[in-house]
Amino acid sequence: MFLHSVNLWNLAFYVFMVFLATLGLWDVFFGFEENKCSMSYMFEYPEYQKIELPKKLTKRYPAYELYLYGEGSYAEEHKILPLTGIPVLFLPGNAGSYKQVRSIGSIALRKAEDIDFKYHFDFFSVNFNEELVALYGGSLQKQTKFVHECIKAILKLYKGQEFPPTSVAIIGHSMGGLVARALLTLKNFKQDLINLLVTQATPHVAPVMPLDRFITEFYMTVNNYWILNARHINLTTLSVAGGFRDYQVRSGLTFLPTLSHHTSALSVVTSAVPKTWVSTDHLSIVWCKQLQLTTIRAFFDLIDADTKQITQKSKKKLSVLNHHFIRHPAKQFEENPSIISDLTGTSMWVPVKVSRWSYVAYNESDKIYFAFPLANHRKVYTHAYCQSTMLDTNSWIFGCINSTSMCRQGVDLSWKAELLPTIKSLTLRLQDYPSLSHIVVYVPSVHGSKFVVDCEFFKKEARSIQLPVTHLFSFGLSSRKAIINTSGRYYNIELLNLGQIYQAFKVNVVSKCTGGKEEITSIYKLHIPWSYEDSLTIAQVPSSVDISLKLHVAQPENDSHVALLKMYTSSDCQYEVTIKTSFPQILGQVVRFHGGALPAYVVSSILLAYGGQLYSLLSTGFCLEYGTMLDKEAKPYKVDPFVIMIKFLLGYKWFKELWDAVLLPELDAIVLTSQSMCFPLVSLILFLFGTCTAYWSGLLSSASVQLLSSLWLALKRPAELPKDVKVMSPDLPVLTVVFLIISWTTCGALAILLSYLYYVFKVVHLQASLTTFKNNQPVNPKHSRRSEKKSNHHKDSAIQNPRLSANDAEDSLRMHSTVINLLTWVVLLSMPSLIYWSKNLRYYFKLNPDPCKPLAFLLIPAIAVLGNTHTVSIKSSKLLKTASQFPLPLAVGVIAFGSSHLYRVPCFVIIPLVFHSLCNFM
């Protein structure tokens, strides 16, 4: 079989492909920053109080429950309903637990205690029985309807309040966020029941793995509704992504569609969230202390003091979310901040006329105002920059309109500042403030603390450096370099030509300082202007720091902004910035964005080899080895040109109309293009990875069959080769009917798995029989040749009364090896619904809806027949020529329609298997 035909050159090539795939996988699973999230803690024992729901509802949804989270005395007090707080509903995601509400619920409780329960939140959580809704979409609609009922039940718990809530805030983790968005698609749902939606690591754009049509249809329904009704949706929505640490849901999938007439949606990556600044994995995003603190601060700022509920003002909600999640000015949120501030009191005023100034404050007894006159600076400089290491929330920088060196009132410029991990900074373009005569920096009286304030004026051209990124195919052999050799505090490096997801670079920043000064901190901020996916790197100077540079979201076609590396530097230091292409990270981007399509490319390669075997059986009468046919037939030029040509023709109106007229689905390549995910050579890379996977899976299946046959011979009496090759054995119809009944009454995937095991059993039995036959043959080569001649002599008569020879058995095993490979991928792609069914067996004996049932009804009879099929019985079939021609177009179809819709892949496998089985009868 396959093990005896391993070609060393091919083996070396496939080993090399494994090496490349490993580089990409390493970048996805390990090529990110360490987990910097702090663990959130409880200070009292957590309690989850089950909320009694109507019996009718419990009977309709026996697997689902609703809980109220509490701790200590709060939990005891709220066992007696009704409630008095602000309702927040937590929706867990794929395989998520209702207990994941603990972290944010505990932090909210501590915050309420700090303000003596002037306001407090009641956190509810839904128990979805940890269903695998990311893999099986049949229960998503059911979950959505249950959440609707939960919202109505929650609001009933607040009857009797002075200001009873009329809506709830929802926090949805993973698929829970999608379920929350789906609420709006329900016929009887009132949009006013939700006042705020926060989603964490929710794939909004498309499913991570579209393994059944129900999940794809659910996504289509939700996204189409939100796009078509964007003008009428007034729900403030925040989507938070985990960044590169979250390899389960890539951040690009979490970005809500940005529509010009729907401005109440924000999407941000945790690495860009102020006071968080870390990347989170898919689970830690629900307990990461930095992120949960930011979320709770925002929730408390959203409270309306009059109603003691979350505000109904959309503008305020969006302002609060921008304040806490997008740009924090290092000040407490104010709905209507006072722009004009009084600069009075017993304070010292100090004029500063230099263009670069630094002040170290330590145990200051007096308040000091440092005034920078702008008249002369406007003639020379374009911008002013100030920073302070004092991270309090007081106003610290103002603008004076008076022409004198002192002013009683000033424009509070602190609201324009930006909070960073170690400083708060402000950059002003002077021409935007023509009425200002002075910039005033306020230094308060401090005792026992030390901080530094720096200000400088500069020309934009002197602080902006253009650095084109290196070419994709430089493979890190060439680099681009920029040297910053000055005493400035702030620089912008414009990263030209960066905008595609397939680009990935390694940026090295080396800092050197003159003199023996103490270690100081520099901040390097990667700013992506077309999406909130910024990331920060903090470095001690002097140092050498590597920064990973790659994108979550590609630059839109109509966007002309340039990605920036903002450098908050130290004076009297030199910075050398080197950028070069990172080939492992490019492979990582391929895996990250397209790894889910790999099964389609694997099946496409196997189908090409399968077609080659059928053709060799037709033309030569012998079936060649799977590995040989894979090397010969699995070529990307047999597939990719057709997909590219179809995509090109679909650009013409007449072809698109013809395409739609025959009801063909949308080409997957067009879907990827709409998501800015198509890039050069990706299909070629995936095809090579797919062929490599097909090769190793063939090697594994062949080795498994031989191992199982050896165990068979060790445990049972040696078998013999069958004396005839009848396809229809007496037990075959009965077995087929049993499997079909199992499929109808329980789960289609279970029936497919059982029929697959039956097929493997038949192949193992044949392998054991062949091994026994060979072991019993005499060693004399002359006798072997006579036997071979005798076998060939009876070849024609074998057609009339076929008998299975050793050569025929080997041919059959070669064909069976390929069929096992195809069936293995069908079983793997159907396993999620089987796992879902088995987990919910105590609630539902029959899976409904069942995505695999139609597949099972076609596949089971074909597998049953193929289990008894031998090559000798189909060599003379009139249908063999047709069967050998089908795999090639189907291999193209798998890539064209199955790479983004994996549930379609088994459909392309069934067709050649059915024709193969029919060859026994025609």
UniProtKB/Swiss-Prot annotation:
SUPFAM superfamilies: alpha/beta-Hydrolases (SSF53474). One of its GO terms (biological process) is forebrain regionalization. The active site is at S174. The keyword Glycoprotein applies. The chain crosses the membrane at residues 12-32, 598-618, 642-662, 669-689, 695-715, 734-754, 817-837, 854-874, 895-915. Disulfide bonds: none annotated. It is a multi-pass membrane protein. Residues 782-793 have a biased composition (Basic residues). It is an enzyme of class 3 (hydrolase). Coiled coil: none annotated. Belongs to the GPI inositol-deacylase family. GPI inositol-deacylase that catalyzes the remove of the acyl chain linked to the 2-OH position of inositol ring from the GPI-anchored protein (GPI-AP) in the endoplasmic reticulum. Initiates the post-attachment remodeling phase of GPI-AP biogenesis and participates in endoplasmic reticulum (ER)-to-Golgi transport of GPI-anchored protein. This is GPI inositol-deacylase. It comes from Rattus norvegicus (Rat).
